[in-house]
């Protein structure tokens, strides 16, 4: 997968590429990054890429021409161009999987200040948001998106690691424990020490559903619950009523 980033802060990504899973993916040639400094496409001696908005208003907007010129140079017929924006579709795990499986060349545009001249919208394929809040720039959101995508690339991490993640199966993850068995009088659930893999699997399944019920009930409203899941939820609700 090739990811190209258009930004006014190209050095923002330097340390990100040098750590953890991202660095490993680069070394394994699973991902190639290219970062483009928007100022190199300003076509003016001061490298200015922003200006005040027509019609008045606070702040500055990033200009349309630099983005257009950069896209003209790097975009391929098979590229997908996205803009990180609070107005975009909320990023989720399903979307991330689709991107990894379907996209070979991704171009990410980063807005700053009050955003980008709206004419850029005619040259993108999608707007993506990482949440209903405002950041100082798109670069942080880009890092989030890249991290989500890279860990799903085949061969970057063990597939079992992400197949058990929260949201991977429309539910939150079950609680996990490690050594010691007892600390501050808090014990690891006995079932996890039993060695009975079927019972452990069933316990984790139930706990995953329970976690989702208590922490993110909105998720359960969006999925078609199986008969087994409905039965487990009824038991949870029954125990709540009984105190």
UniProtKB/Swiss-Prot annotation:
One Pfam family in the UniProt entry: tRNA_m1G_MT
Binding site for S-adenosyl-L-methionine: 111, 130-135
UniProt-listed Enzyme Commission number(s): 2.1.1.228
Principal location: cytoplasm
First-tier enzyme category under EC: transferase
Catalytic function, reaction form: guanosine(37) in tRNA + S-adenosyl-L-methionine = N(1)-methylguanosine(37) in tRNA + S-adenosyl-L-homocysteine + H(+)
Classification via InterPro entries: Alpha/beta_knot_MTases (IPR029028), tRNA_m1G_MeTrfase_C_sf (IPR023148), tRNA_m1G_MeTrfase_TrmD (IPR002649), tRNA_m1G_MTases_N (IPR029026), tRNA_MeTrfase_TRMD/TRM10 (IPR016009)
This protein's UniProt keywords: Cytoplasm, Methyltransferase, S-adenosyl-L-methionine, Transferase, tRNA processing
GO MF, one annotated term: tRNA (guanine(37)-N1)-methyltransferase activity
GO biological process, one term: tRNA N1-guanine methylation
Gene3D superfamilies named in the record: 3.40.1280.10, tRNA(m1g37)methyltransferase, domain 2
Gene Ontology cellular-component annotations: cytosol
Localization, UniProt: Cytoplasm
CDD domains xrefs: TrmD-like
Family: Belongs to the RNA methyltransferase TrmD family.
Record function comment: Specifically methylates guanosine-37 in various tRNAs.
Subunit structure of this chain's protein: Homodimer.
NCBIfam families: PRK00026.1, trmD
Official protein name in the record: tRNA (guanine-N(1)-)-methyltransferase
Species: Phytoplasma mali (strain AT)
Name of the coding gene: trmD
């Amino acid at each position: 997968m090739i990811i190209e980033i258009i930004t006014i802060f190209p050095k923002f990504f330097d340390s990100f590429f040098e750590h953890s899973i991202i660095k490993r993916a680069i070394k394994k040639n699973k991902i190639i990054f290219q970062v483009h400094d928007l100022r190199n496409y300003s076509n003016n001696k001061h490298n200015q890429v922003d200006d005040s908005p027509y019609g008045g208003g606070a702040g500055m907007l990033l200009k349309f021409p630099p983005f257009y010129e950069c896209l003209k140079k790097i975009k391929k017929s098979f590229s997908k161009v996205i803009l990180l924006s609070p107005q975009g579709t909320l990023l989720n795990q399903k979307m991330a999987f689709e991107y990894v499986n379907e996209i070979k060349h991704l171009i990410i545009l980063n807005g700053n200040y009050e955003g980008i001249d709206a004419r850029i919208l005619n040259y993108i394929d999608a707007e993506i948001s990482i949440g209903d809040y405002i950041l100082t720039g798109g670069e942080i959101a880009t890092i989030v998106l890249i991290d989500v995508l890279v860990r799903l690339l085949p061969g970057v991490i063990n597939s079992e690691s992400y197949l058990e993640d929260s949201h991977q199966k429309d539910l939150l993850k079950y609680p996990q424990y490690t050594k010691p068995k007892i600390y501050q009088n808090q014990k690891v659930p006995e079932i996890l020490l039993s060695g009975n893999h079927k019972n452990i699997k069933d316990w984790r399944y139930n706990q995953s559903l329970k976690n989702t019920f208590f922490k993110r009930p909105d998720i359960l409203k969006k999925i078609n619950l199986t008969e087994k899941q409905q039965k487990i939820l009824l038991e949870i609700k029954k125990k709540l009523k009984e105190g």
